[in-house]
Design a protein with these regions (language model features):
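N-terminal helix-cap/turn-to-beta initiation motif at the start of protein domains
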Residues: 29-37, 428-441, 453-458, 560-568, ...
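Central antiparallel beta-sheet cores of small beta-barrel/beta-sandwich binding domains
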Residues: 442-504
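Edge beta-strand at a domain terminus
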Residues: 410, 508-554
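His/Asp/Glu-enriched, well-ordered alpha-helical/loop segment
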Residues: 33, 103-104, 111-126, 134, ...
């Protein structure tokens, strides 16, 4: 007796102590019960690697107390016999907007908004509204009963929530899906930090591009570091304060496609941050590069629906990338797992959360191991946010967050009966539903009423009423415990509904009904045949899904295998060397290890070399396009008058089909320029056209150039009436932009030089790192070259005089259609001209352009290049070079140099490309005719010894592409015939960028546009 009283007293003390820890009063008596439940005779999946057969799970006060085969149950425990059912940890979603307010952008009256250069956010926050480090999800979290119920229904118990707005989004909060107050749901108010490439609802003009987003984020990291080490900073900045507090938390980066994953990781590498990256579902397309990031991924589960290709004209607009992604996307997780890349799943982005398990099971069908799928939903997400001591498995001391299922979680017909969150039960389906399935003889008011067929599952029966032997009616039905309610219209000719309510007794349903005329009558249904369960498919014999190959790049004309450098002997060709040897007849060239090793006659083939007969053909170095905008996701950052901080290398698009098309025209390298939206543009990128290679393999990192611009674009002449805010608005103002920025860059460089020269460096005294001024300081130090968009003589003279006075060098004037007027001044200063062959009169700025421009500059000693600035023109740059022979009598060899050696000189890469010489890169083109002829076509184009375009193989590729398209179209037609959902075809035309093009970043580019 004394022992019982002691135990009771101890329980009261614990209960009272628990109450004492609560700060919220309760209206009424406190419920002192401990919520002690034991779930026995269950298959308990403790974690993906541990399963207990016929085990017991004991929970108490919202926590797991014990788990195992032999569990001693305390007195007063409520025992639930699960009779072999399964228990799993509740699921975790790391990318949720549950309970978060919707971010809404203010719309200006009349739909026209004056450019907003500065932040309009009130308070001592940072200068850019897209940086929202101060956002604290825990302060704006409000439980949403409906959304919580929807998530619990598919098995989730905990979610990581954050505000999905902005580039830096602040900190996330870990919350449970209880139906109680936020105070109960909140597990960790500062669980994570969140980032994206979308500026969200910010109405500021900057950034206006993805590369601008990257630059802003990089600068924010540098500013936060400076702010933290500089106690005497001249400003208070709550955004930087908050950023320094959250940057040590697990950092999540939301992206939209495979290249954004790589871009995010590149930012993280610069600052020693390993982001956890939410992908776009196309990671399989660049799996090796993504694995090299060592990032953990968050994978979406919204797979593309088949396109409705019934109409062949509709089918024609679908790209190969769209077709292939539809086929391969469900296997993304399987391929990620096979590559040993850790990942978690998210339900974010799903059109219908009810399709969650359908997508998971589809991923399993495509080869994803069940253990990996469970890990991606439980233990791994818990470990990523350092919450494995609270959630993610069924171990003592963790929250009692678990689900009870009918069987294996990944089985086709599995049912989730209950979801327990913090020890509280939420019923999703009746756990011991009576099995009333079968065929019944229906009698209403002692008269035959047809048949009642009940199929489906015990938990979710499916009903059919059969009248007049053949007419099947689907009634409205509600089964609660053993009480059944049916309502249906028995005869369409008679208005009204028959309503039946009854209960199960043995094998008979009986009760009372109401006829359409209002009469109350008895009814019953007698079981005549038990439901015959269809045998489940043997999953061990299911064949893996057959899919086509992954292409590199993942578009039409992509390669199944990337070309490799070959050892070649090209014999008896007419070789245009671009060297002092000139044009060699019947000459040989040897290529080894990506380099030209020998040039001469009657050369012996190296061991293992493939011999190419060049008889009657011309061999040249590859064409170099000095001014190009291909292979980019965006080209202008026009949010400010200077965007020297942005880098075109951050937005290189290796999937652009123009790479392949230009290889077909003999182009092997392109200089990718920022557009002409502002006076000081972004840092350019030079790429080799290695079709199918990664971004890093294409970009030449040692080529450091930058785009400047003059003229009407930079002063926003054609941007509309509202664009009257950004400086400069006149050509006079453009001059002051250059003076202002370079004078500040001089002072900036001077301050760093002074700091670096001190013997004892104190971090607090270091200047603030400014990546915009870094680029300009490199120009002053001759470490970065300027290519300047230019048309009018007066402005060109202005910039040359500014450069003279500030002691920096202009490398190249591009366009330069009035270059013939000042070629002597350009030659004197060593400035090159990269121009069009014969474009003129297409706008007022070029009204005095002439087709003899290139020749006149050449004759004055200017290094002249012919460029494209156009994806289509670049396919025929050999013909553009030929025009200089027509207009001005430029010698043929010199004309050819204008698209090969001269652009190499202007880009300072003539030591490795631009001519055929031993030791240079084997970037070669074999033409079927004189390269300046309009009839000339490349037989093959190689880059560093690898053939990336071969005309014969191209013909074969076109045939195989057509066969692959038709195969995929037939698969889509089969999907539609089987009743699966389809979507309307959407044309996916690649963007053809030009200097003036602007694209916003309120939403990031998608991978399959």
């Amino acid at each position: 007796m004394f022992k019982q009283l002691s135990t009771l007293f101890s329980g009261l003390v614990v209960s009272i102590c628990c109450q004492a820890q609560q700060t919220f009063p309760q209206n009424g008596a406190y419920d002192e019960r401990p919520g002690r439940y034991a779930f026995t005779n269950a298959t308990i999946v403790v974690d993906p690697k541990t399963t207990i057969e016929n085990g017991t799970l004991l929970i108490e006060n919202g926590l797991i107390s014990q788990v195992g085969k032999q569990v001693k149950l305390p007195a007063g425990t409520v025992v639930v016999d699960l009779k072999g059912k399964y228990i799993y940890p509740s699921l975790i979603d790391l990318d949720s907007d549950y309970g978060m307010p919707e971010a809404k952008r203010d719309r200006p009256a009349g739909g026209r908004q004056t450019p907003q250069l500065e932040s309009n956010k009130k308070g001592a926050f940072g200068w850019n509204q897209a940086i929202q480090s101060e956002n604290d999800a825990s302060l704006i979290f409000t439980p949403d009963a409906k959304k919580a119920a929807d998530l619990r229904k598919i098995g989730f118990g905990t979610v990581l929530v954050h505000s999905h707005d902005g580039i830096v989004r602040g900190n996330g909060a870990l919350v449970t899906l209880t139906d109680e107050a936020a105070n109960k749901a909140l597990l960790n108010r500062k669980a994570s930090a969140h980032f994206s490439f979308s500026k969200g609802i910010s109405s500021q003009t900057y950034p206006s591009s993805t590369m601008g987003v990257v630059a802003l984020l990089r600068q924010n990291y540098y500013d936060a570091e400076w702010y933290a080490r500089t106690p005497k900073a001249k400003e208070a900045n709550l955004s930087l304060d908050a950023f320094n507090q959250i940057k040590t938390l697990p950092s999540f980066f939301e992206t939209g496609d495979k290249y954004s994953v790589l871009r995010a990781d590149k930012v993280g590498d610069e600052f020693g941050v390993q982001y956890i990256i939410k992908g776009g579902g196309d990671e399989y397309q660049r799996i090796n590069e993504i694995k090299a990031t060592k990032a953990t991924l968050i994978l979406p589960l919204q797979f593309p629906e088949a396109y409705d290709v019934t109409d062949p004209w509709d089918a024609d607009v679908i790209s190969m990338a769209q077709l292939k992604h539809w086929e391969l996307a469900p296997g993304n997780a399987s391929l990620v797992a096979r590559a040993q890349i850790p990942f978690a799943f998210t339900s974010a982005g799903m059109k219908n959360k009810a399709d969650f398990w359908k997508s998971i099971k589809t991923a399993v069908e495509y080869g994803l191991p069940k253990e990996k799928a469970l890990e991606a939903l439980t233990t791994l997400p818990a470990s990523l946010i350092k919450a494995e001591g609270q959630i993610g498995s069924l171990k003592p001391g963790l929250l009692a967050n678990f689900i009870i299922t009918s069987g294996d979680l990944f089985d086709k017909d599995n049912i989730i009966y209950e979801n327990w969150v913090q020890g509280k039960k939420f019923i999703l389906a009746p756990i011991n539903a009576p099995d009333i399935r079968g065929t019944y003889l229906l009698t209403i008011n002692n008269q035959p009423g047809g048949k009642l067929e009940i199929a489906g599952s015990p938990e979710k029966p499916e009903y059919k009423v059969i009248v007049q032997d053949s007419v099947k009616i689907t009634p409205k039905a509600i089964l609660s415990n053993e009480l059944l309610t049916l309502s249906y219209q028995a005869d369409k000719k008679v208005t009204g509904t028959t309503r039946l309510t009854g209960w199960l007794t043995g094998t008979t349903l009986s009760g009372e009904g109401i006829l359409p005329n209002g009469a109350a009558v008895p009814w019953n249904a007698t079981l005549t045949q038990k439901f015959q369960q269809t045998a489940a498919a043997d999953t061990t014999t299911i064949k893996p899904k057959e899919t086509g190959p992954i292409l590199y790049p993942f578009v039409g004309f992509g390669n199944e295998q990337l070309p490799k450098s070959e050892t070649l002997l090209i014999k008896n060709a007419t070789v245009w060397t671009n060297e002092k040897e000139g044009i060699l007849q019947n000459a040989d060239v040897i290529v080894q290890n990506g380099k030209i090793t020998k040039v001469g006659k009657s050369l012996a083939a190296p061991s293992g070399a493939k011999t190419v007969d060049g008889t009657g053909k011309h061999l040249t170095s590859g064409i170099i396009d000095e001014h190009s905008h291909i292979a980019l996701f965006t080209i202008n950052e026009g949010g400010q008058t200077s965007s020297a901080e942005v880098r075109m290398s951050d937005v290189v698009n290796p999937d652009d089909v123009n790479i392949y098309r230009q290889l077909a025209g003999g182009v092997t390298a392109s200089h990718l320029l920022h557009g002409s939206a502002n006076s000081i543009g972004g840092q350019s990128a030079m790429i080799k056209l290695k079709w199918g290679a990664s971004q890093s393999e294409m970009v030449l990192p040692d080529v450091k150039t930058i785009k400047f611009a003059l003229g009407e674009n930079v002063k926003q002449s054609n941007w509309g009436d509202v664009a009257r805010v950004r400086f400069p608005q006149t050509r006079m103002g453009v001059e002051q932009v250059y003076f202002d920025h370079f004078l500040r860059a001089k002072e900036y460089a001077k301050s760093w030089k002074s700091f670096n020269s001190t013997s004892k460096k104190v971090a607090a005294n270091a200047p603030r790192r400014d990546i915009e001024l870094d680029a300009l300081a490199e120009i002053l130090d001759n470490q970065r070259s300027i290519t300047c968009h230019s048309y009018v003589q007066s402005e060109i003279n202005m910039l040359m005089h500014v450069a003279d006075s500030l002691k920096f060098k202009i490398n190249t004037f591009t366009h330069i259609l009035e270059g013939y007027k000042l070629a002597d001044g350009m030659a004197k200063r060593g400035i090159g001209g990269s121009t069009f062959a014969d474009w003129w009169a297409y706008k007022m700025e070029v009204k005095e352009a002439i087709p003899y421009n290139a020749a006149l500059m050449y004759h004055q000693g200017v290094t002249v290049a012919i460029n494209s600035d156009d994806a289509e023109m670049a396919r025929r740059l050999n013909q553009e070079a030929a025009k200089t022979v027509e207009y001005g009598g430029v010698p043929e060899e010199e004309a050819w140099k204008m698209v090969t050696l001269n652009p190499a000189k202007l880009l300072h890469v003539d030591n490795r490309m631009g001519s055929i010489k031993a030791g240079k890169d084997a970037d070669l083109v074999l033409w079927n005719a004189h390269p300046l002829s309009i009839y000339a076509r490349p037989e093959f184009t190689m880059v560093e010894g690898a053939v990336y375009f071969d005309r014969k193989k191209d013909e074969e590729k076109q045939k195989s592409m057509q066969q692959e398209r038709e195969k995929l179209i037939q698969k889509m037609l089969n999907d539609k015939a089987e009743g699966k959902p389809t979507q309307k075809p959407q044309a996916a035309q690649p963007k053809m960028w030009h200097c003036e093009d602007i694209v916003g970043v309120h939403t990031e580019h998608e991978g399959h546009r």
